[in-house]
């Protein structure tokens, strides 16, 4: 199982740790999508920026 993560809000005025988390996920701009492995590390990062991203589960990698 994998997660498709899309950035839906920008980082202006956000805390540094939230900006760093988006970068770690591979997101740089609004509308960008990445696919990441569904594990506890990724889930924790998504939780940190849950108000800035949209997440859906997809089959495969």
UniProtKB/Swiss-Prot annotation:
According to the UniProt record, one GO cellular component term is: cytosolic large ribosomal subunit
Keywords in UniProt for this one? Ribonucleoprotein, Ribosomal protein
Q: Does the keyword Lyase apply?
A: no
UniProt xrefs under InterPro entries: Ribo_uL30_ferredoxin-like_sf, Ribosomal_uL30_bac-type, Ribosomal_uL30_CS, Ribosomal_uL30_ferredoxin-like
GO MF, one annotated term: structural constituent of ribosome
Question: Where are the membrane-spanning stretches?
Answer: none
Which biological process annotations from GO are given for this protein? translation
Q: Name one Pfam family in it.
A: Ribosomal_L30
* Subunit-structure text: Part of the 50S ribosomal subunit.
Q: Which NCBIfam families match?
A: rpmD_bact
In terms of PANTHER family, this protein maps to:
LARGE RIBOSOMAL SUBUNIT PROTEIN UL30M, MITOCHONDRIAL RIBOSOMAL PROTEIN L30
Question: What's this protein's name?
Answer: Large ribosomal subunit protein uL30
What is the species of this protein? Corynebacterium urealyticum (strain ATCC 43042 / DSM 7109)
